[in-house]
Amino acid sequence: MRTIKGPGLFLGQFAGDVAPFDSWDSITKWAAEKGYLGVQVPTWAGQLIDLRKAAESKDYCDEFAGIARQNGVEVTELSTHLQGQLVAVHPAYDEAFDGFAAPEVRGNPKARQQWAVEQVKLALKASKNLGIKAHATFSGALAWPFAYPWPQRPAGLVETAFDELAKRWTPILDYADEQGVDVCYEIHPGEDLHDGVTFEMFLERVKNHSRANMLYDPSHYVLQCLDYLDNIDIYKDRIKMFHVKDAEFNPTGRQGVYGGYQSWVNRAGRFRSLGDGQVDFGAVFSKMAANDFDGWAVVEWECALKHPEDGALEGAEFVKAHIIRVTEKAFDDFASGGTDDAANRRMLGL
């Protein structure tokens, strides 16, 4: 067993145009002051990272990581959640997702997809330059508008969607393998990879690619009533990344899983700051330790109620309190009689 690293913080919800969130130097200092030891970097945030430079220049990456270390944090992983989303977009979502892309490819789905693929590949190369072994992203979605089986889905519709999704991602996964980096898909509603079954459907089509892995986030499982602890045991060999995020699901006689088109504040299922939701993180961290997860515990702060800076501060302490420093010996070693093969055979009557 290995002790999980952390706490880390995903900067996606914090990067902005106001200090200290508007530069790499200042945001890493801020994260360290909040108690974090690592940061996960949203590569679409140009005020923090020049992704192309990071992919093309080892010197740039050395300086980038050096600034973080000098300020007290490590770079845990890079993220292309927004770009990965654009690898596969159903036409119904074209306009909604267009803002994720560079201005020059908006309104052109084919060019936008090509741009997205290039972005993910740049991030994979940048990860290699930074010495990082795992990368966070979304799968995108072609079948999501048909998630509920009404009207009746035509035979082969979902299979065709997943065949195409695998076709788009396989060259990226091959490139990831060349860079020595795992692609960790955040299993998330709105993506075709939104639970274990859909991950397996994808995995089958990419021929169990060794670089196709999972970003585990229990909050997304709480909101769809999935057993988030059993999930860790089932996919322990594929879980290469961990978002620590809380959630609560409080159905009423008026709404349930679908949320009734309500705001996040008024939904039956909603994300919460760590400790304010229903996730049993004691059990989650125990499972992670028992299953030998050796990555980072990265706080992803999302809450419709609490101020983000309060959530960040509390999140660091929460993770510190839950990380299990794994034991190096059995608790009952004091009662050991030693190892003696002859004695073992006598005890067995052999």
Locate each region found by the language model.
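Acidic/histidine-rich catalytic cores of soluble enzymes
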Residues: 4-7, 22, 38, 78, ...
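A short, Lys/Arg-enriched amphipathic alpha-helix followed by its capping loop at the start of a domain
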Residues: 7, 29-36
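Active-site beta-loop-alpha junctions enriched in small/polar residues
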Residues: 10-16, 42-44, 80-83, 140-142, ...
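The substrate-binding groove and active-site-proximal loops of carbohydrate-active enzymes
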Residues: 15, 49-55, 104-114, 159, ...
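Active-site acidic/histidine proton-transfer and metal-coordination neighborhood
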Residues: 21, 25, 30, 66-74, ...
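A structural motif
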Residues: 36, 41, 73, 127, ...
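Glycine-rich, proline-tolerant flexible connector loops at the mouths of alpha/beta enzymes
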Residues: 41-64, 84, 139-146
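C-terminal helical cap(s) of enzyme catalytic domains, especially alpha/beta-barrels
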Residues: 308-331, 335
